[in-house]
Amino acid sequence: VALQWVIQEPEKRDMKTKLAHMIDGMQDDLTGFKQPVKAPKKVNSDYLAMYMMGDHHFGMLADGETKMAGDDADWDVKIATSILLDSTNRLASRVGDAEIGVLLNCGDFFHADSSANTTTKGTPVDVDTRIAKTFKLAGRLFQALINKMLETHKKVVVINVRGNHDSDMACHLSSCIELLYAKEKRVDVLQNYSKFIHYQWHNNLFVFHHGDRMKHEQILQAVIRNLDDEWSQSKNRYCHLGHIHHHTARELGSMHFEHWGSLTATDSWHSSEGYGAERSMTAVVYHKDTGEDSRVKIKVG
């Protein structure tokens, strides 16, 4: 028992440090709890707006000068913060009066999963700053995003899918947001202990997965097997994924699969391998009975 405790202790200290940095960052200069955000006066309970945040790779460092000619976009925590805030603000102003707003992080919000500057599986990556500072700045960013959505929607649901870059960090992120908004009844943070998350709203079933190491057919079978009640109760069935950094859509059986694009610039490795896609963020509006109603897309250069 003593040996096991010694092995686990550094990990526990690391998690406590991350939690402390995020809470400190959220409370430094943001006033969400001291001055609660006022709910909108008029909303339409027939509609839900889902903000699709593709792989954001917060904490990644990309220098345009080191990449393929024409692919010269830089990326660091300041740029990542500015672009995501601007895109979310623009989407919030255009999605209408939907009662519920869902902030969906499709996974890989963080570029690295530990202070070793590696992904969850240990792949080295280029980072902008220390993991503790990255986590602190992420806390500030998420509070700003959620508070903006609280101005537009009566209720905000936060979903953090666990990616292949940030499986552990995504769990810490959800725990911190849940603690911070524990007294705010208008915010609901879904648990992300599993890589599969689902959310049922009236006649709509939403399933979320990062999309790594899992084919659509496998996801469909897992949903039918494990969510049979929710499946039978919902006419409109959607699976939202990230991972591939560009938008694709497919209808398999009676379920719609979509991988969502990303606002992120390419890093030097992906650029050298010829990868790249349109950089965008989309919000989809759903009707409680008939499913998807409309969508708005914001593109960045």
Predicted regions and their residues:
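A generic short-segment signal for beta-strand/edge and adjacent turn/coil regions
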Residues: 15-22, 71-75, 126-129, 166-168, ...
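Generic structural motif
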Residues: 6-12, 56, 204, 287-289, ...
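Core catalytic region of metal-dependent phosphoesterases/phosphodiesterases
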Residues: 37-56, 66-174, 179-185
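Glycine-rich active-site/cofactor-binding loop and its immediate structural neighborhood
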Residues: 60-61
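Conserved beta-sheet core of the metallophosphoesterase superfamily
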Residues: 150, 177-195, 200-300
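Non-catalytic propeptide/linker segments at domain boundaries
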Residues: 1-44
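Short, motif-level signal for alpha-helix interfacial/capping segments enriched in acidic residues
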Residues: 31-41, 87, 219-232
